[in-house]
Design a protein with these regions (language model features):
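Tight coil/turn sites that cap or link beta-strands
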Residues: 38-40, 49, 59, 70-72, ...
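Extracellular/surface-exposed low-complexity segments
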Residues: 3, 15-35, 262, 283-294, ...
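Surface-exposed loop/turn positions within long extracellular repeat scaffolds
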Residues: 222, 241, 264-277, 284-295, ...
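Glycine-centered low-complexity coil/loop motifs and glycine-rich tracts
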Residues: 42-51, 72-88, 99-113, 124-145, ...
């Protein structure tokens, strides 16, 4: 026989076997060459058996084995009145392009429409799990079930119904990636089925995912563990007296640009719970187009487990139409933009809410912290630009069972140091605020800023005298102390009238009169003051050897002189308006101007005391030299110059 005729007969026989209508289980051997094989006639399984079993060549993948169900074709698993309905399609390592309808068979428990592992499914029409017929304890079949599945859904996937049992899931299994542009729905039953259920799920939703209707309990739209959900559509719990959740499970990460809703309860005029986090480490990122209807709940922590949730409002998301319930031992962290809950916030025993100053302000109708619950406040804000920061606010009040359970932590603060921040309820008990203790008038007023090495704190609000009779630890209400090896920046014009003492680290002045009306400016050994180009006026300067006063293009006016044993550096001007400034430090790197005004006195004893500075003298300049001194500084003005000491002056 001619070779070409034999090939043609072989192809015709394959085409006939694929195109013929069959009843009973059929097996299709896919070719493994990446060329799709088509099903053009309907197939129905019998006696609870699968309609279509897929066989593939050894060591081939789903990308090489492709099966297409053509338009108007029905593939349905066999019915069983005593057992499980048959699968519509069963196999491994293949791709299914569905343009028809694939059904699981009806049975005591409904059959799965498409069952197997390592499958890729492109669904352009309908997939139906089989219906359960067994009554109590039975269930509808899943639309899709297996492990290592990729689902691109453009039309509809349904779990099977079971009027006496539980509806089937639309999609179930582990290691499943879903891109949904159509609808995925759990089946109906006494308890509704879940839309998608499983573990290690990666879901992108651009349309609708819903739990099934339940006579008692609606199904969850998405449930399981290790779930990532990027939602741009609607994810909705199933209807029922107890409605299902939009999302339920543990280790869940949600990016929400769409609608997440629990069932709307018309009798209560409110939504049932939208999201339940049952354990693990969870996150919820909400955006301006986010809609959440119903409460967000964290279950009590599992035995030997954890339950943490990070809620981040990325860009001013709309209000959450529900509350926040934090179960025993669980923790919530809120950050980003302000978060508004139209319901209530409740924090149970050993649970915690974690907030950051200058970050999210959380608002709710009522906020209740039960006994042994905790508020952990991160006060590590680097730029303090408000008199106070609101952390929590409430329409009807904030109830805190134990104020000692408001705990502050601050990575800018030297370990073990007294905090410069105080967090408490306001007088009306409807706001929790953090403020600088400098401004506290209820016994916690405090003026020391102890900044950790390599840390920087900028104070951008004006500091005035605290006149309260109730201050902390002997503070006078008007003196500022900088301690710790880090950096403090004063970037506002201040009005305090006490002393400024830099014990260690660096104090940077970033505004005119940042030192207020300082009486005495003290610089201890190892401390530095950087004037950073701004003018300051104080009464008296007292610097220890080993300190640095960096004029840095600024101007410092001394109304009552002082003693400078430390280093003066940079350029700019140091003006002595009154009293005597006695300089004994090494200032060879100072290239600015000393101005001695009428009635004032500048005393130096070596060339290094003046550095390379100009001296504009209208008062008295005393050069007390004990050794030979070659004076190279330019001296101007009409003041007196006095030479004392045994050294020669040239």
């Amino acid at each position: 026989m001619n070779k070409n005729i034999r090939i043609l007969q072989f192809l015709v026989s394959i085409l006939y076997s694929v195109q013929s209508h069959f009843s009973g289980a059929q097996t299709i051997q896919l070719n493994g060459n990446g060329i799709p094989e088509s099903i053009t006639r309907s197939i129905t399984g019998v006696d609870g058996n699968a309609a279509l079993n897929i066989s593939v060549p050894y060591k081939t993948s789903y990308t090489q084995n492709i099966l297409s169900v053509e338009s108007s074709i029905n593939i349905k698993g066999g019915t069983s009145n005593t057992s499980i309905g048959g699968a519509g399609v069963y196999g491994e390592n293949f791709t299914l392009n569905n343009n028809g309808s694939v059904w699981g068979g009806d049975g005591y428990n409904g059959g799965i429409a498409v069952s197997g592992n390592k499958i890729s499914i492109n669904n352009y029409r309908n997939v139906y799990g089989g219906n359960g017929l067994g009554g109590s304890g039975s269930s509808g079949g899943a639309g899709l079930s297996g492990d290592d599945i990729i689902v691109d859904n453009y039309r509809s996937i349904y779990g099977g119904d079971d009027v006496g049992g539980t509806g089937g899931s639309g999609v179930t299994g582990s290691n499943i990636t879903v891109h949904n542009s159509g609808g995925i729905l759990g089946g109906n039953g006494v308890n509704g089925g879940d839309g998608i259920n499983g573990s290690n799920l990666f879901i992108t939703n651009d349309n609708m995912i819903s739990g099934g209707y339940g006579i008692k309990q609606g199904g969850d739209a998405i449930s399981g563990n290790q779930i990532t959900l990027n939602n741009n559509g609607i994810v909705q719990g199933g209807y029922g007296p107890d409605g299902g959740c939009s999302v339920y499970g543990e280790d869940i990460h949600i990016n929400n640009h769409g609608n997440l809703s629990g069932l709307y309860n018309s009798q209560k005029d409110a939504y049932n719970t939208s999201i339940i986090f049952s354990g693990g480490y969870n996150s919820l990122d909400i955006y301006s187009d986010s809609v959440i209807n119903g409460d967000i709940k964290l279950a009590s922590i599992p035995v030997n487990g954890t339950n943490e949730l990070i809620i981040k409002n990325i860009n001013n998301a709309t209000a959450i139409n529900g509350g926040l319930m934090i179960g025993n031992g669980s923790s919530v962290y809120l950050s980003g933009k302000n978060s508004i809950f139209n319901g209530n916030i409740s924090i149970d025993e050993d649970a915690s809410m974690n907030l950051s100053v200058g970050n999210a302000n959380v608002h709710a109708n009522t906020i209740t912290l039960k006994s042994d619950s905790w508020l952990n406040i991160d006060t590590s804000i680097k730029n303090w630009t408000q008199d106070y920061y609101t952390l929590l606010s409430s329409d009807t009040g904030i109830s805190i069972a134990d104020n000692s359970h408001i705990v502050q932590y601050n990575v800018l603060l030297t370990e073990g140091a007294e905090s410069y921040v105080y967090t408490s309820l306001n007088d009306d008990d409807n706001k929790l605020i953090s403020m600088l203790r400098w401004n506290n008038t209820k016994g916690m007023g405090y003026g020391t800023f102890n900044i950790e090495k390599d840390a920087t704190l900028n104070i951008g609000v004006s500091l005035s005298d605290n006149l309260s009779p109730l201050l902390y630890d002997g503070w006078d209400g008007k003196s500022l102390t900088k301690s710790g090896n880090g950096t403090l920046i004063l970037s506002a014009t201040n009005n305090y009238t006490g002393n400024t003492e830099v014990k260690s680290g660096v104090l940077i002045l970033a505004a005119p009169d940042a030192l207020g009306r300082t009486e005495y400016l003290y610089l201890s050994r190892g401390a530095e003051l950087d004037m950073n180009g701004y003018p300051q006026t104080i009464s008296k300067l007292l610097t220890a050897a080993g300190s640095v006063l960096n004029i840095h293009g600024g101007s410092l006016i001394l109304n009552n002189g002082g003693e400078s044993a430390g280093t003066i550096a940079g350029d700019g001007s140091l003006n002595i308006n009154g009293g005597m400034l006695d300089i004994t430090g090494n200032n060879r790197n100072f290239s600015g101007v000393f101005t001695v005004n009428k009635g004032a006195h500048l005393a130096v004893s070596t060339a290094d005391n003046l550095g390379t500075a100009f001296v504009d003298n209208y008062g008295t300049l005393t050069l007390n030299s004990t050794s030979a001194w070659q004076l190279t500084n330019n001296i101007s003005g009409y003041g007196n110059v006095r030479k004392t000491g045994a050294g020669a002056l040239n």
